[in-house]
Amino acid sequence: FTSPFLDAQEKIIVCPNELQQEWANAEIGVIIHFDMPVFHPDYNWRQFGTHPSPSTFNPSSLDTDQWIHTAKSLGAKYAVLVAKHCSGFSLWPTTAHEYSIKNSPYKNGKGDIVAEFVASCRKYGIKPGIYASTTANGFLHVDNPGLVKKGSPVTQEEYNKIVETQLTELWSNYGKLFEIWFDGGVLLSAKWRS
């Protein structure tokens, strides 16, 4: 990169840092999306009040080792699990709200698919990553870019606290993560523009 504002003798060489290089070297990764719509294909998370009950979520034959063994077989070096997508259903027993695996029959409400996924990744030498949608939550009637809509059971401040709690849980309870993936844009409020 050469800038016309620099002396012709002065050049800037941009190189990736160590973490950027590690990510580039991983080359092949997989994303695993396992959410409430797997069990309810007609479910539309934007239709507030129609979310499926956690009692219908019971992947009794789930095998995260099979997921990660398959990923390793295709040459993947990392895998990303969608821990919470737009439905708002959480694949770990979050303390932030009730729409999660803790209120499902899966492992009698004691299951934690995020923990199972991370353990499988470590077992097979695959670097674990987590995807979390913070800008949409059908259960709480929140839509991009993270705005609480009219009729929501929570205020914007309460939703922001829920997001903070869930992100703290995800980044604190599962050890070192290779990738953290956010989707859906950023809220461009006056606070963030200043």
Question: What is the meaning of each model-derived region?
Answer:
Residues F1-S3:
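Bacterial N-terminal signal peptides
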Residues F5-S194:
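Mature catalytic domains of secreted/periplasmic carbohydrate-active enzymes
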